[in-house]
From Swiss-Prot:
Phylogenetic lineage: Eukaryota, Viridiplantae, Streptophyta, Embryophyta, Tracheophyta
Short name of any one Pfam family annotated for the protein: ATP-synt_ab_C
Protein name per Swiss-Prot or TrEMBL: ATP synthase subunit alpha, chloroplastic
Free-text function comment from the UniProt entry: Produces ATP from ADP in the presence of a proton gradient across the membrane. The alpha chain is a regulatory subunit.
Domain of life the protein comes from: Eukaryota
The species this protein was found in: Barbarea verna (Land cress)
Entry's family note: Belongs to the ATPase alpha/beta chains family.
Compartments reported by the entry: Plastid, Chloroplast thylakoid membrane
Length: 507
């Protein structure tokens, strides 16, 4: 028979009473009324914020977007196949936020900042709200430093500055992504952190971009945020904001960042899908009334910060897809009105073999020459003028057979200048090479060559100047000006190479 010791029992009871924690945790819970198509309606979530994260019984996370008198409309950030009618939901009290750190560089992540490249977890000690307010007027300064894309047509005639927002717009398959990825490649060694956001694209297309960046060593300073076409609409809608939060982290740490949204048409479609399923009233083209605000609050986060905040910058290159060149559709007009200019890519030019297929006539940069170095300003003005005159003459020349010599010369010059703007993909040029190329064209050195010889000659000229006249590049990179000395070295180099080239071609 076991003897019961009363003092031992009383000690145990006393210990348990002392250890008893009277803390009460109050959890705000609700019940699922209806679920389907990536949307759930919840009853009983009393104190929930707009945009708050809610957690379902089986672990799926959702965002409360519609707060109505008798229920809450939630968009699901997962497939939600295990959610049932009547299952419980709890409010987390948090607005969507992501961890941020330097460790994200070189990684491929999803809209919730979880890695999807199979290379393990990413360590981060800080976090940022996905939706944070844009810098105010006092926090900014005007754009004055160039962000070189490596594409002659853009850097000379549609210059982009650090902190600018420049739209890349065009039909499908006109090389929009190629312009954006070339810009990333050109930031090598420029201390610019790049963020590429892929929204609603094929997984194979994203893999192709990532492979291209890895092969050329550009992933070292790049973060890829990807939500492919099979991702829930809520995640496709969130992806650009996640990218912006990561870029802001670096911007506020006095660094320069470049962010590419590829593309905002797909984000608008995902947002339209969510809004219609939440039964929000449709507007033009069935988009909800606040689709302008969707893009404006995203693009306003790009800025050039004031000297008090460390002069960091975030340059945005949003991409928008048009249908058969219609720039007057709803989303294109919205984004054009928000951004500081647009680069228009034309399917006709692309099919005619002019690549990058930039229509210089209707492309514009509202920052202009403030975002160019002096050397580029010196040569670009003449290029713009001559190309504009050429475009006018070309249209006129189609109806006239007998043209005077001056007109024929101008047309010949224009054709060679157009040839000079052609570039292969993934072959960005340094600003010194661009200045030299434009100078060669606008000063008539290409006029004696056949159109088919122009690109071959320019490639050889760049190599020749790099090896035999390195002082030209040194002067431009140190003074940022095409000085008289640099010009005489350049003239000498062009003439020497031209003689050699013509001799080679004769043989």
């Amino acid at each position: 028979m076991v003897t019961i010791r009363a003092d031992e029992i009383s000690n145990i009871i006393r210990e348990r009473i002392e250890q008893y924690n009277r803390e009460v945790t109050i959890v705000n819970t609700g019940t699922v009324l209806q679920v389907g198509d990536g949307i759930a309606r919840i009853y009983g979530l009393d104190e929930v914020m707009a945009g708050e994260l809610v957690e379902f019984e089986e672990g799926t996370i959702g965002i409360a977007l519609n707060l109505e008198s008798n229920n809450v409309g939630v968009v699901l950030m997962g497939d939600g196949l295990m959610i049932q009618e009547g299952s419980s939901v709890k409010a987390t009290g948090k607005i969507a936020q992501i961890p941020v750190s330097e460790a994200y560089l070189g990684r491929v992540i999803n809209a919730l900042a979880n890695p999807i490249d199979g290379r393990g977890k990413i360590s981060a000690s800080e976090s940022r709200l996905i939706e944070s307010p844009a810098p105010g007027i006092i926090s900014r300064r005007s754009v004055y430093e160039p962000l070189q894309t490596g594409l002659i047509a853009i850097d000379s005639m549609i210059p982009i500055g650090r902190g600018q927002r420049e739209l890349i717009i065009g039909d499908r398959q006109t090389g929009k992504t190629a312009v954006a990825t070339d810009t990333i490649l050109n930031q090598q060694g420029q201390n610019v952190i790049c963020v590429y956001v892929a929204i609603g694209q094929k997984a194979s297309s994203v893999a192709q971009v990532v492979t291209g960046l890895q092969e050329r060593g550009a992933m070292e300073y790049t973060i890829v945020v990807a939500e492919t076409a099979d991702a829930p609409a809520a995640l496709q809608y969130l992806a650009p904001y996640t990218g912006a939060a990561l870029a802001e982290y670096f911007m506020y740490r006095e660094q320069h960042t470049l962010i590419i949204y590829d593309d905002l048409s797909k984000q608008a479609q995902a947002y339209r899908q969510m809004s219609l399923l939440l039964r929000r009233p449709p507007g033009r083209e069935a988009y909800p009334g606040d689709v302008f605000y969707l893009h404006s609050r995203l693009l306003e986060r790009a800025a050039k910060l004031s000297s008090q905040l460390g002069e960091g910058s975030m340059t945005a290159l949003p991409i928008v897809e048009t249908q058969s060149g219609d720039v007057s559709a709803y989303i294109p007009t919205n984004v054009i009105s928000i951004t500081d200019g647009q680069i228009f890519l034309s399917a006709d030019l692309f099919n005619a073999g002019i690549r990058p297929a930039i229509n210089v006539g209707i492309s514009v940069s509202r920052v202009g020459s403030a975002a160019q170095i002096k050397a580029m300003k010196q040569v670009a003005g003449k290029l713009k003028l001559e190309l504009a005159q050429f475009a006018e003459l070309e249209a006129f020349a189609q109806f006239s057979s007998d043209l005077d010599k001056a007109t024929q010369n101008q047309l010949a010059r224009g054709q060679r200048l157009r040839e000079l703007l052609k570039q292969s993909q993934s072959a960005p040029l340094t600003v010194e090479e661009q200045v030299m190329t434009i100078y060669t064209g606008t000063n008539g050195y290409l006029d004696g060559l056949e159109i088919g010889q122009v690109r071959k000659f320019l490639v050889q000229l760049r190599t020749y100047l790099k090896t035999n006249k390195p002082q030209f590049q040194e002067i431009i990179s140190s003074t940022k000006t095409l000085t008289a000395e640099a010009e005489s070295v350049l003239k000498e180099g062009i003439q020497e190479q031209l003689e050699r080239f013509l001799l080679q071609e004769k043989l």
